[in-house]
Swiss-Prot record:
Gene3D superfamilies in the cross-refs: 6.10.250.3130, S15/NS1, RNA-binding
Family note: Belongs to the universal ribosomal protein uS15 family.
Pfam families: Ribosomal_S15
Protein encoded by which gene: rpsO
Official protein name in the record: Small ribosomal subunit protein uS15
SMART domains xref list: Ribosomal_S15 (SM01387)
CC terms in the record's Gene Ontology section: cytosolic small ribosomal subunit
HAMAP family, A to Z: Ribosomal_uS15_B
GO process terms (BP): translation
Amino acid sequence: MISKTRKAEIIKEFGGSEANTGLAEVQIALLTEDIANMTEHLKEHKKDVPTRRTLLKKVAQRRHLLDFLIKKDVNRYKEIIAKLGLRK
């Protein structure tokens, strides 16, 4: 789970202001942070099935947002992929 301060930093970095939480880039960045945290958790707790299920849901949700973004604006898609270091 992301702390409030880290969440605010991500929102400000990708959304421009702390109030701009609905932007696709912000949502993708927050999901990426959650996914990274869950991945680290699962490396230690291999049999934690509920967390694994939640991880897969979050990956799918991020994929849908990335698909939406590539349809709307390819340049924004390329920027977010480069910033977060995601594969295509």
